[in-house]
Amino acid sequence: MAGHSKWANIQHRKKAQDNKRGKVFTKAIREITVAAKLGGPDISSNSRLRLAISKANSSNVPKDTVERAIKKALGDKDQNIQEITYEGYGPNGIAVIMECLTNNKNRTVSELRHVLSKHGGSLGTKGSVLHLFKKVGIIKVLDTTEDELLSHMENIDLIDFEIIKDGCILFTDPNKLFEIKKYFEEKSIMVENEEITMDPITLINIDNMQQEKILNLSDKLEEIDDVQNIYMNVNLG
């Protein structure tokens, strides 16, 4: 259904961001802590925590580390972490969204502005690029052909899908992510991955030299401790 491979582009971005393994653990723990603090420790009623734990498991974060993060969230009443989304521009005018968790907003803004300006970009105002993306849920189901997927279409509500070598990638409303995951699990169809992401409405094509600059910017933004996720409307696939 997809005109271009959104999954390939997402995987390229994730691979670049996941190269720093220690940072992946830190991010996973921080997201679990914030999710538990905001919504409580019960995953049946806290979908954000359920998703955070699922992502931590995918990154091989030890179970006891996950449990400690939840306990810390419940016991540390003084930890004042804010969840803030910043918007900006990179080289060639590409749009950049930076999702952050921070206990010092001024520090975070300063670090983001410094990295963006050093790499030919700038920090934008609220709403400057957010409209160029849409929030979507993504589910990867294994060992499922297109015909098999089509047989389930009456029972699930999808925005889009892609057929890949080892299964299917499903794009859905974020609010229906766990409902669809549960549907497939009840059918004994293995779900390997689920997440919520910001999907660019239109991708900008770039050459190899431009891609190197943009990946370098992404790496430097990832090195900022407060940054959780980075999204760009550029074709990296």
Question: What are these regions, as identified by a protein language model?
Answer:
Residues 1-124, 129-138:
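N-terminal cationic and glycine-rich segments that engage phosphates or anionic surfaces
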Residues 138-237:
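Positively charged, low-complexity, intrinsically disordered RNA-binding extensions
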